[in-house]
Amino acid sequence: MAKKVVGLIKLQLPAGKATPAPPVGPALGQHGVNIMAFCKEYNAKTANQAGFTIPVVITVYQDRSFSFILKTPPAAVLIKKAAGIESGSGVPNKNKVGKITKEQVKEIAQTKMPDLNAASLEAAMSMIAGTARSMGVEVVD
């Protein structure tokens, strides 16, 4: 018989740097999960992705055990890294803060493909380009 799920927790944590401090501690503590066990496992699995924020979905079971699924980094984080900027524009329609090429958009779309609900790479590319535009990043050929 399958274990009974008692909670789903969604967090965005820096890769390889999860600590029992907030937001991890309180979120997992409510469900009675061993916080240190989660932190060790998460840090081990994300050690090779340093510098990124990795979303994670933690499933907590009735016997206080847990499993988690790592997602791909948010599109905005990948776009900022590709454009070499700290943050997006406050007024994206007026002042542009950076540029990325179609090739970079394609790379980001391929990275994000498992988590996007796009049928094709072209659809994924247009989603990523839209995210870039809303951040004040221009997409150039």
UniProtKB/Swiss-Prot annotation:
The keyword Cell cycle does not apply. InterPro entries: Ribosomal_uL11 (IPR000911), Ribosomal_uL11_bac-typ (IPR006519), Ribosomal_uL11_C (IPR020783), Ribosomal_uL11_C_sf (IPR036769), Ribosomal_uL11_N (IPR020784), Ribosomal_uL11_N_sf (IPR036796). Part of the ribosomal stalk of the 50S ribosomal subunit. Interacts with L10 and the large rRNA to form the base of the stalk. L10 forms an elongated spine to which L12 dimers bind in a sequential fashion forming a multimeric L10(L12)X complex. Keywords: Methylation, Ribonucleoprotein, Ribosomal protein, RNA-binding, rRNA-binding. GO terms for cellular component: cytosolic large ribosomal subunit. The keyword Chloroplast does not apply. Pfam families: Ribosomal_L11, Ribosomal_L11_N. Forms part of the ribosomal stalk which helps the ribosome interact with GTP-bound translation factors. One of its GO terms (molecular function) is large ribosomal subunit rRNA binding. This is Large ribosomal subunit protein uL11. Belongs to the universal ribosomal protein uL11 family. One or more lysine residues are methylated. One of its GO terms (biological process) is translation. It comes from Clostridium acetobutylicum (strain ATCC 824 / DSM 792 / JCM 1419 / IAM 19013 / LMG 5710 / NBRC 13948 / NRRL B-527 / VKM B-1787 / 2291 / W). SMART domains: RL11.
